[in-house]
């Protein structure tokens, strides 16, 4: 490949991409937002027809898109269920034009056109082509100095969201995918003309040095002539913490002929550090007196690896993260303002998260700024999902440039700690290594991996990676390499640990993690599907229509179960919360685990519609779990119980180990953990144990007690509390009689519907029928303990293609816990751990032929594709007699 570093430096003379900066009195700006003339160019003939010279009849409002301005082809396909539907679709070139007025005092100024985010563009001034730019992940800037004199001018911009973007990026990455962000056409974010003196500060890069409380500051000036004798001042102050700190100013001499400078700027012994728990930021100002000044933000932090964990400023930390796929249903594109992103990260913090991975895309500056302020560790990626091959030279060149731009544009941000080349890449490792080596040489402030879940984890750690984001660590038998608890049936036998292992809180991922010498972050952890909430439909008031919701709702209505939609949603959602908890705690119980990235805290509206979130697509609560309850098992400090099972019998000796995952600011060795086992208000046993010193996963002690004899089963709760704090956690334990003899009485128990059974029913008898599995194969979907993974449609088709058994596709049970049948089997209205041996080996019956109003005692919730009425336990009236079918 060509020398891309040299190529990038040459491009900087025309396209100048700067860090976050304040506009000072020495810099002027003209806001270009507002009404623009507009024309579509669907056949791409606009340049041939010299549209830059023409006046356009239509108008649009910018910042905005063709979608927000209702331009393009009106979408009439209301049957699409793959993703939310755009009201207006457009792919190709579009032209935007307006007149601008350059003030007299801009004469002899350096003038730049700044477009914060757009698609590949070409710019004309008064019919003269200025240049082209195809940056997707960073602002586009055009040097207009030699095109603009004071007075009136015509500015024309051609934006192309078609073939100017490499096909693989356009079709699958979250920078463009129709599943979430959409492949919009337009200009979003800041759009402005900027004027500076000919000598200006082009860039400031601040490299934190925690050990001596300083920053290595690299400054690039616009030119090197006429600067001899001038001085540059640096000043910095912490601005967003209760503990204020202002560093001493420093002054440096500029040298004629030198435009690049490097200084070590001392912040002082009292300098404050940045972390997820204490996100202290500095504003660093560089000033050439009376000529120019520029301010950037940075955090004094040191994010590293230590064996198989990450550290922040020398302290062990754990990344509790979410996957982000650019889900913004009102606009169909990423948020560009600080407040939306601060809301986003505040919600993440409410649910105990401190990390966010951007799947195959890179967010804008406002996102990094918000994460800096809120204390979130970020992992942006190149906009690629798929093949990473040397032979794809044009694509590789595009991605290399995009990555170099990301490094230059966003690296000052304290929150930017990790970087990956893309999602689930395959291809040439030597090319991946070339990319990472290049980026690491440009930007040493980050840790790098070749990609998130490259080769689907089958190759494990590859030399050159600082960390792994993966679902498995290499290849191996069974679940021995798994780094998350759930998979599709296409990727793991019976869907992995949670669906195919007797419920316990002992299992962990240590066996897999021993295969990696670097930190491992679980890739796309969770993916537990819930039934959709149709009340959400009214929230879609923007550019995307919830026609997929409408189709799913109509299907349920035709199946005669529409009035159960809310119950399906709540029951499947309650069970998914428990599954997420189990997966998260399994991560925390793993001594070598460095973090996880949930898929997801919020719903994903694409790929067949994957309602896998505790929050909806708008990051609003679905009402399934309170943040406080969620933080009990997802926080910087989590007390944990490890026990071999959740179902016990009276008189049995209960055994459990109490651990604590402490990734807080300090050791808790001066605190203690108390435990208590309760049946309602009645205490069955309690105790207290000391907490060991240190950070990480620590063992506090063991619990042993003999459970009391019981006549009737009940659900107990084991509560763990850390003294003097709000940290607590609790575990359900079901306690059953040691022996309970059941008397059949006058009930006929049968496995098949024989003549004798039919005669018993005709004579008014009571029958318990438990049919043989082989007799039900044509009328059952099979038993699935967890809720279906991701969505049924996508992985059913994959399983069919690779000739593997598909998931049963169900979403848990719905029942009435007050029904007499549960007098000796305590339950909620949804699935919980005590149901495992029943549900896992069940074969729920398809009851579509039953009367529409009929409801089973225990109903199994089907997915939105099939909408079967499914029964696990049914009571039927046959010939005036009672038949219980299970």
Predicted regions located by residue number:
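Beta-strand-rich binding/interaction modules
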Residues: 123-125, 214-253, 261-263, 652-690, ...
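Catalytic beta-strand/loop cores that center a nucleophilic Ser/Cys/Thr
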Residues: 500-504, 796-884
């Amino acid at each position: 490949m060509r020398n891309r570093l040299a190529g990038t430096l040459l491009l900087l003379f025309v396209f100048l991409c700067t860090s976050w900066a304040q506009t000072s009195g020495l810099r002027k700006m003209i806001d270009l937002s507002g009404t623009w003339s507009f024309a579509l160019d669907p056949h791409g003939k606009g340049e041939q027809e010299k549209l830059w010279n023409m006046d356009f009849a239509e108008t649009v409002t910018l910042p905005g898109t063709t979608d927000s301005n209702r331009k393009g082809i009106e979408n009439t396909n209301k049957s699409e269920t793959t993703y939310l539907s755009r009201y207006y679709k457009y792919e190709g070139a579009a032209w935007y034009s307006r007149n601008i007025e350059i003030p007299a005092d801009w004469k002899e100024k350096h003038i730049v056109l700044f477009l914060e985010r757009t698609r590949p563009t070409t710019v004309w001034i008064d019919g003269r082509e200025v240049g082209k730019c195809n940056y997707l992940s960073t602002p586009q800037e055009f040097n207009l100095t030699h095109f603009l004199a004071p007075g009136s001018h015509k500015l024309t911009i051609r934006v192309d969201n078609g073939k100017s973007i490499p096909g693989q990026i356009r079709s699958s990455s979250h920078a463009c995918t129709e599943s979430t962000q959409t492949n919009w056409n337009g200009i979003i974010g800041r759009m402005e003309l900027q004027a500076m003196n000919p000598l200006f500060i082009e860039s400031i890069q601040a490299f934190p040095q925690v050990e001596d409380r300083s920053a290595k500051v690299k400054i690039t000036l616009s030119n090197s002539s006429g600067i001899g004798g001038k001085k540059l001042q640096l000043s910095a102050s912490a601005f967003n913490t209760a503990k204020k700190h202002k560093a001493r100013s420093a002054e440096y001499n500029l040298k004629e002929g030198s435009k690049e400078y490097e200084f070590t700027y001392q912040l002082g012994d009292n300098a404050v550090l940045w972390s997820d728990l204490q996100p202290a930021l500095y504003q660093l100002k560089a000033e050439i007196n009376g000529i120019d000044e520029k301010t950037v933000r940075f955090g004094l932090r040191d994010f590293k690896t230590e064996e198989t964990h990450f550290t922040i400023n020398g302290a062990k930390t754990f990344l509790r993260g979410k996957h982000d796929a650019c889900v913004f249903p009102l606009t169909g594109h990423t948020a560009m303002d600080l407040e939306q992103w601060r809301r986003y990260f505040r919600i993440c913090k409410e649910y105990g998260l401190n990390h966010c991975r951007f799947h195959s895309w890179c967010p804008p500056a406002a996102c990094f700024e918000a994460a800096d302020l809120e204390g979130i560790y970020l992992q942006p990626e190149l906009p690629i999902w798929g093949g990473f091959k040397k032979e794809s030279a044009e694509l590789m060149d595009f991605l290399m440039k995009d990555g170099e731009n990301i490094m230059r544009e966003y690296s000052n941000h304290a929150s930017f700690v990790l970087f990956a080349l893309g999602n689930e890449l395959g291809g040439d490792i030597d090319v991946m290594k070339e990319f990472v080596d290049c980026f690491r040489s440009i930007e040493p402030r980050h840790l790098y991996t070749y990609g998130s879940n490259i080769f689907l984890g089958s190759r494990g750690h590859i030399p050159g990676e600082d960390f792994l984001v993966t679902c498995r660590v290499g290849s191996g038998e069974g679940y021995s390499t798994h780094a998350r608890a759930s998979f599709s049936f296409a990727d793991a036998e019976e869907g992995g640990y949670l669906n195919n292992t007797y419920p316990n809180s002992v299992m962990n991922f240590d066996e897999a993690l021993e295969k990696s010498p670097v930190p491992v972050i679980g890739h796309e952890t969770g993916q537990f599907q819930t039934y959709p909430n149709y009340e959400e439909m009214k929230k879609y008031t923007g550019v995307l229509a919830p026609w997929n919701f409408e189709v799913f709702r109509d299907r349920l209505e035709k199946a005669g179960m529409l009035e159960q939609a809310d119950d399906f949603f709540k029951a499947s959602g309650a069970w998914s919360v428990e599954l997420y908890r189990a997966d998260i705690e399994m991560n925390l119980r793993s001594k070598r685990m460095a973090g996880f990235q949930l898929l997801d805290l919020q719903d994903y509206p694409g790929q067949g519609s994957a309602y896998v979130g505790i929050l909806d697509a708008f990051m609003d609560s679905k009402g399934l779990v309170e943040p406080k309850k969620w933080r009990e098992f997802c926080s910087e400090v989590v007390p944990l119980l490890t026990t071999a099972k959740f179902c016990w019998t009276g008189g049995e000796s209960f055994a459990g180990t109490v651990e604590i995952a402490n990734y807080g600011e300090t050791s808790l060795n001066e605190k203690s953990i108390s435990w208590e086992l309760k049946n309602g208000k009645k205490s069955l046993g309690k105790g207290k144990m000391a907490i060991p010193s240190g950070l990480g996963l620590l063992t506090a002690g063991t619990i042993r007690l003999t459970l009391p004899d019981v006549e009737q089963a009940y659900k107990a709760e084991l509560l763990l509390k850390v003294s003097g704090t709000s940290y607590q956690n609790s575990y359900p334990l079901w306690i059953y009689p040691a022996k309970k003899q059941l008397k059949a009485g006058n009930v006929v128990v049968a496995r098949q519907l024989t003549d004798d059974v039919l005669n018993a029913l005709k004579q008014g008898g009571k029958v318990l029928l438990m049919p043989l599995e082989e007799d039900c194969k044509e009328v059952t979907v099979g038993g699935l303990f967890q809720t279906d993974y991701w969505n049924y449609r996508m992985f059913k088709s994959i399983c069919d293609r690779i000739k593997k058994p598909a998931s049963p596709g169900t979403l848990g049970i719905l029942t009435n816990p007050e029904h007499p049948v549960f007098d000796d089997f305590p339950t909620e209205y949804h699935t919980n751990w005590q149901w495992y041996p029943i549900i896992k080996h069940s074969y729920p019956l398809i009851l579509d032929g039953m009367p529409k109003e009929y409801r089973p005692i225990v109903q199994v919730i089907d997915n939105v594709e099939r909408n079967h009425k499914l029964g696990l336990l049914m009571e039927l009236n046959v010939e005036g007699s009672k038949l219980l079918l299970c």
